[in-house]
């Protein structure tokens, strides 16, 4: 029994682990099923690890027992590990599922960013194409122009043509004998410094040659690019006739040729309100365009004029005291109160031109352009104004301060200081007419004086000849009479008494008596100089005869 029990014990011991092993295997299978249900991806990954333990129990009994004990311990730990792993494995699986939409969102954001970049590149390319340029009407000093040229480019299309500048200079510098090349050159250098005519003098020579060939100007003095020139008055009419003959469908008018881009700065200058400027700017403008007033040499004249205008109420002093500070124009309606004398006109044009910044509303611009430059169609002109404002804003010439689109207020981005001829052409025409009248009067006076001088020069020569002719006749006739009359009488005296020397002292006494006859010689003005000596000679001869008779009487008495 002992043996049976001893033999039976190991069997019993062996049977227990087998049962437990089968149970464990069953539990493993159940766990695998659970894994199959929950984690299909994990099964495929760990299938190589799970399959080998199934073949191991079939190899041998003892190995199975040892393995069963080991697996019992490992299975317990593996079960816990699997349970622990299932939780984090489920988490990444759940996390992996939402990663796909995130990737899709990222792809969409990337595509949107790329499209934005493309749009930015296109906009940059457009900005590069439309570069800011300096307009031709901008009034800049040499230093300001150099700075601006570094940042921007000069506008090539809107730059004024040399031919038009030349005709303007000839008209401005015109005098009696035409406009000299030196004066024309100075005018262009002073008014159009951007042309750099000091360095590029060939521009003026070429323009003179072209205009001479076209017949627009005429050379009065000199040859080539020197001398004086005059604008031909009928040249414009002939050019217009030729254009009318050539063109059959469209008729070109000067209003259509004028661009609104060139009109806008002057419109801003006239319409900007209120107009004000400092004393330094007024002085600079007056000294530049009114050299006759000599403000640089006599600044007190300008100061006194400004103070007088403030006292009269024609100007308002906003800042400063006395003649320093900022002055503002006062108006009665649309006309300024200041004006009349040359100094007042100079101050008026200086304040209107040097006012900065120059701003204007679109409504005022519309009104100004429709009144002064109506064109063929008013609606089309307004449309052109809208387009020019947009183009000028893109070029950087204008800036919109308020409003949007074609409404609000615009401002000039560059300084613009027009000359008095451009700002007030009517006054300049009046001044030119007055100057021409004065010149005509002076010319007429000079002609009259020259005619009088010529007549005086022509008349006196015959008088001088008449005066010169009679004296030689009287001289030629009178002297021989003297000699004939005087010669025989002295001959008689020595014949009567040759040896007596007493008569000479007695001859002196009658000479003394002849003194009262001296004033009688001075009195006759009409008598000639030749008659005077003859009369004196006769008087001298008479006393000599009386002396002789007295001597004879004395001799007789002695006898």
From Swiss-Prot:
Region (Disordered): 1-132, 421-559
Compartment list: Nucleus; Chromosome
Sequence motif: PxVxL motif, positions: 256-260
Bias (Acidic residues) ranges: 429-459
SMART domains for the chain: H15
Keyword terms, alphabetized: Chromosome, DNA-binding, Nucleus, Repeat
Biased composition (Basic and acidic residues): 51-68, 96-128
GO cellular component entries: chromosome; nucleosome; nucleus
Entry protein name: Heterochromatin protein 1-binding protein 3
Organism: Gallus gallus (Chicken)
């Amino acid at each position: 029994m002992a043996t049976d029990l001893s033999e039976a014990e190991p069997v019993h011991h062996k049977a227990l682990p087998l049962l437990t092993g089968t149970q464990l295997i069953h539990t493993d299978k159940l766990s695998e099923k659970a894994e199959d249900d929950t984690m299909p991806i994990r099964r495929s990954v760990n299938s190589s690890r799970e399959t080998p333990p199934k073949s191991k129990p079939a190899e041998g009994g003892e190995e199975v027992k040892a393995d069963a004990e080991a697996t019992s311990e490992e299975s317990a730990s593996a079960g816990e590990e699997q349970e622990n792993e299932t939780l984090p494995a489920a988490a990444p699986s759940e996390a992996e599922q939402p990663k796909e939409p995130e990737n899709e969102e990222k792809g969409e954001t990337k595509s949107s960013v790329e499209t934005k970049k493309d749009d930015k590149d296109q906009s940059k390319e457009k900005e590069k194409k439309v570069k800011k340029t300096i307009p031709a009407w901008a009034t800049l000093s040499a230093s300001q122009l150099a700075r601006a040229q570094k940042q921007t480019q000069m506008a090539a299309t809107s730059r004024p043509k040399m031919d038009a500048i030349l005709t303007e200079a000839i008209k401005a510098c015109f005098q009696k004998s035409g406009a000299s090349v030196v004066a024309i050159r100075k005018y262009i250098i002073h008014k159009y410094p951007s042309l750099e005519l000091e360095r590029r003098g060939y521009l003026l020579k070429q323009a003179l040659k072209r205009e001479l060939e076209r017949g627009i100007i005429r050379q009065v003095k000199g040859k080539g690019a020197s001398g004086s020139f005059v604008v031909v008055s009928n040249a414009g009419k002939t050019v217009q006739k030729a254009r009318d003959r050539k063109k059959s469908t469209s008729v070109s008018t000067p209003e259509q040729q004028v661009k609104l881009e060139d009109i806008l700065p002057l419109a801003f200058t006239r319409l900007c309100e209120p107009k004000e400027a400092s004393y330094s700017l007024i002085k600079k403008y007056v000294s530049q365009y009114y050299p006759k007033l000599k403000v640089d040499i006599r600044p007190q004249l300008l100061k006194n004029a400004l103070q007088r205008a403030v006292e009269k109420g024609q100007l308002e002093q906003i800042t400063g005291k006395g003649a320093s500070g900022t002055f503002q124009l006062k108006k009665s309606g649309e006309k300024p109160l200041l004006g009349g004398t040359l100094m007042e006109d100079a101050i008026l044009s200086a304040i209107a031109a040097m006012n900065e910044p120059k701003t204007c509303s679109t409504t005022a611009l519309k009104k100004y352009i429709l009144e002064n430059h109506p064109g063929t169609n008013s609606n089309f002109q307004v449309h052109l104004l809208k387009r020019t404002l947009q183009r000028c804003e893109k070029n950087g010439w204008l800036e919109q301060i308020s409003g949007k689109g074609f409404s609000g207020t615009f401002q000039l981005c560059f300084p613009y200081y027009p000359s008095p001829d451009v700002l007030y052409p009517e006054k300049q025409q009046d001044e030119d007419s007055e100057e021409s009248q004065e010149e005509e009067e002076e010319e007429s006076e000079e002609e009259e004086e020259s005619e009088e001088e010529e007549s005086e020069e022509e008349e006196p020569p015959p008088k001088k000849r008449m005066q010169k002719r009679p004296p030689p006749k009287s001289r030629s006739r009178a002297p021989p009479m003297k000699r004939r009359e005087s010669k025989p009488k002295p001959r008689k005296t020595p014949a009567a008494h040759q040896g007596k020397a007493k008569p000479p002292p007695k001859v002196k006494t009658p000479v003394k008596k002849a003194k009262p006859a001296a004033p009688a010689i001075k009195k006759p003005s009409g008598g000639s100089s030749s008659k005077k000596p003859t009369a004196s000679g006769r008087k001298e001869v008479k006393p000599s005869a009386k002396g002789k008779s007295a001597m004879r009487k004395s001799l007789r008495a002695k006898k």
